[in-house]
From Swiss-Prot:
Main location class: cytoplasm
Active site: 74
Reaction it catalyzes: a ribonucleoside 5'-triphosphate + H2O = a ribonucleoside 5'-phosphate + diphosphate + H(+); a 2'-deoxyribonucleoside 5'-triphosphate + H2O = a 2'-deoxyribonucleoside 5'-phosphate + diphosphate + H(+)
Keyword set, alphabetical order: Cytoplasm, Hydrolase, Nucleotide metabolism
Known EC number: 3.6.1.9
Similarity annotation: Belongs to the Maf family.
A GO-annotated cellular component: cytoplasm
Protein name in UniProt: Nucleoside triphosphate pyrophosphatase
Molecular function, one GO term: nucleoside triphosphate diphosphatase activity
Compartments where found: Cytoplasm
Cofactor(s) needed: a divalent metal cation
Class of this enzyme: hydrolase
PANTHER family linked: BIFUNCTIONAL DTTP/UTP PYROPHOSPHATASE/METHYLTRANSFERASE PROTEIN-RELATED, BIFUNCTIONAL DTTP_UTP PYROPHOSPHATASE_METHYLTRANSFERASE PROTEIN-RELATED
Length: 198
């Protein structure tokens, strides 16, 4: 059976490769901004939005490829005041996000949904709590300048597996959820369905 990751995230692909899985990647091209805005307007939580985005990606690809198992994944970031941050579109927006998060806790929700024949067949959502230390404007400017090419694709403006680890005072949650996918539940399910080695 073929396994497809419906994501352009290098971090998610690296996690699956490191786990020894055979898979292909295909971008789903879901309008995440529009879907998120619609779900927020309907009163959905950041947790549910991560799940809905992951499902939309998986179902979109799975509906075109009969019999193929597709994994969609997405992450959302919520500040303690309930506001959500999206992927930054410019270095200036990344710096603004980091200023908003500095000295505060935020929650990161990472969802994975498996779909086959256009319908979801499995899902999991992980949650991590992260505390970003106080950051100076000079540190933020240097960090964004040095890491823009990688952080532009992340909701929190960091890759914790790289230079982003310098941002944090404290982290609660598994590292895979922070990188972008609830890997342990996913691997358990893939083994149970024969898509990963026992």
């Amino acid at each position: 059976m073929t396994l497809i990751l419906a994501s352009q995230s290098s971090g998610r692909a690296a996690m699956l490769r490191a786990a020894g899985l055979a898979f292909e990647t295909t971008a789903a091209h879901v309008d995440e901004e529009m879907l998120t805005a619609s779900l927020r307007a309907a009163g959905q939580t950041p947790r549910n939005i991560a799940d809905a985005l992951a499902e939309a990606k998986a179902v979109k690809i799975a509906s075109r490829l009969p019999g193929v198992t597709v994994i969609g994944a997405d992450s959302t970031l919520a500040l303690d005041d309930g506001s959500m941050l999206a992927k930054p579109e410019t270095p200036e927006e990344a710096a603004d996000h980091l200023r908003r998060m500095a000295g505060r806790r935020h929650r990161l929700f990472s969802a994975a949904v498996a779909a086959r024949d256009g319908a979801p067949i499995w899902r999991a959502i992980g949650e991590a709590k992260l505390w970003i230390r106080p950051l100076s404007d000079a540190f933020i400017a240097d960090y964004v300048a040095q890491n823009w090419d990688s952080i532009r694709w992340t909701v929190g403006c960091y890759e914790i597996e790289g230079a982003g680890v310098q941002l944090f005072d404290r982290v609660e949650g598994d590292p895979w959820t922070i990188i972008g996918m609830p890997m342990l539940p996913l691997l358990t399910w893939l083994r149970a369905t024969g898509l990963a080695p026992q």
